[in-house]
C-alpha cells in the first residue's frame, strides 16, 4: 500500500506533490489586494508592485472612458475615481522585500483564500491537496460513504461485485482566519522533499528487483492485436456459446431417460460453474479430535461445541474428524459445510455441502445453504437451479404442475430462470396463507431470489416473515442485516447483526458484516475491533495456529481490516496486517 507516489497517484492529477506545487504557484496578487483593503495592508508586496500609471497610459484610459456610450451602460468614471483613491493611499506603499519566500510566509490567512480546481485522485491525495490549499475555515467535506456489501450469511458482496472501498466521511475542521497559526512552509517543503525522496527510493528498488524484459515492436503489436480480440464482446459471446454447445453435445446422451427436467437443469448449471475442488482437511497434528477413543463420537462432540457456544473453528475440526472416520457421514458433511460458511470460509463450506449432496441429493438443508453460497460467489444460475431442486424436493406437486403446464421450458438466461423459480416459490407460499402454517424456508428462498434481482425491500419483507416464525434464528437475523445494509440502511443493519451475535456470539460472518457496516457509517475503530474479534475466533486454543492451521484460510477479514486501518490513517497498524499475524499486538489499543 502506497500513500503517495505510487500507482495512479503518480499521475499529474493524482500526485499530491504535483497538486501542492500547482497551488503554491498560483498568482494570489488579486486576492491579496482585495483582502488588504480593510485595515492594515499586509507586508507581502513581493508578488505585486504598486506602480503608478504613466502619462501616456492615463491618456489612453481617459480616451477609453470618455467615449460615447449608451445611457443605460455601466458607468466606469466613479469606479476609476475609487481605484485612483485606493491606489494612491499612503499606507499602501511599502518597500519591496528581497526574499520572496519570506514574503510568501508572511501572507495573512485571509489573503490565501482560493477555490482550487477539483482534481480526481485518491482520498489521501485529496486530503493533502485541501490541506495545502488552505480552504476557507467554514468549509467541510462530507462525502457519502461507499459500501462494501455484507454477506447474507453467505451473501456475496454487492451482488457479486468486488468489494470496493470508497472514501469515508472526512470532516476537515479549520479555525477562523484570525485564529489560524502561521504555517511553517520551510518544514512543509522539507517534509514533502523527504516523502518524494522515499518514494523515489522505493521505485528504484522495485525497478532493480523486477526482471528486465525487452519486447520488440513487432511482438508488441501482435500481442496487442490478440489482447484486443480477447477483450472484445464478440469473442466473449462466441466463447460462451461455444462452451454451451460443447456441453450440450457431451450431455446429449448423458442424461437418463427417466431424469426429471429440474434434475437436468441442475446438472447443466452446476456443471458450468467453477469447480471448487475437494475439501481440504487440516493437518493431523492440528486436529486433537482425531485421537479420540473409539467410544467417543467426534460428530456428537462437534454438535455439543456448537450448542455450548464454542468457536466454530473447533467445531469444524470435530466434524472433520468424524468424516475422516467415515467419509460417507452425510450429517457430518452437512454440519461442516454450515459451520465453515458461518465461519467466513465460503469455499470450504461449498466443498463440504457439495459432498453432502453427492451422498444425499435431496438434502433440503444442504440445498438451501448451497444456493446461498452460490449467490455469494456469483453463480446465479447454479443458485437458481439449486433452489428449484430444493422446492422440487419439498413441494414436488408444485413443480410437476408447472412442468405439465409448460413442458417445453428451456430457460437459458438468468432472468428467465429467476422468474420461473420465483413463481414456484410464490405458489408454495400461497399454500400457507396464514402465519401459523407459513414455511419459513419458503420465505427464505423467496428472499434469496429477490436479493439476486436487487429487490431488497421484498427481500427484507421475506426475511422478516421468516423471523416471525423463527425469532431466535441467528442466521436469519444476519441475512436480514445484510439485506438492510444493501438497502443503504446501515444503522438498522447494525441492530440486526447485534441481535444475531446476541444469539450466537461466535458467529464470525455476522461479526464480519458488522465490521463492514461500521466502516460504512464511519465507526472505524469499532469496525477494527469486530474484525479482530472474528480473526481471533479462527484460532484454536492449544494449537499453534501460526504454523499448523494452513488450510481453508479466509482473506476477507484481513482485507477489510486493512481498509479500516486506512480509514483511520494508521499506516503503522496497516503494516502489521499479514498472514499468521500475532493478534496480541493489537490488544493494547483495541478491545476484542
UniProtKB/Swiss-Prot annotation:
Any GO molecular function: peroxisome matrix targeting signal-1 binding
GO cellular component assignments: cytosol; peroxisomal matrix; peroxisomal membrane
Keyword set, alphabetical order: Cytoplasm, Isopeptide bond, Peroxisome, Protein transport, Repeat, Thioester bond, TPR repeat, Translocation, Transport, Ubl conjugation
Motif range (WxxxF/Y motif 4): 262-266
Residue spans of biased composition, Polar residues class: 22-46
Residue ranges, annotated region (Amphipathic helix 2 (AH2)): 58-76
Keyword Protein transport: yes
Chain positions of cross-link Glycyl cysteine thioester (Cys-Gly) (interchain with G-Cter in ubiquitin): 10
Residue segments, region Amphipathic helix 4 (AH4): 223-239
UniProt motif (WxxxF/Y motif 2) ranges: 128-132
Motif WxxxF/Y motif 3 positions after renumbering to this chain: 185-189
Signal peptide segment: none
Function: Receptor that mediates peroxisomal import of proteins containing a C-terminal PTS1-type tripeptide peroxisomal targeting signal (SKL-type). Binds to cargo proteins containing a PTS1 peroxisomal targeting signal in the cytosol, and translocates them into the peroxisome matrix by passing through the PEX13-PEX14 docking complex along with cargo proteins. PEX5 receptor is then retrotranslocated into the cytosol, leading to release of bound cargo in the peroxisome matrix, and reset for a subsequent peroxisome import cycle.
Domain comment quoted from the record: The TPR repeats mediate interaction with proteins containing a C-terminal PTS1-type tripeptide peroxisomal targeting signal (SKL-type).
Assembly, per entry: Interacts (via WxxxF/Y and LVxEF motifs) with PEX14; promoting translocation through the PEX13-PEX14 docking complex.
Protein name in UniProt: Peroxisomal targeting signal receptor
Classification of source organism: Eukaryota, Fungi, Dikarya, Ascomycota, Saccharomycotina
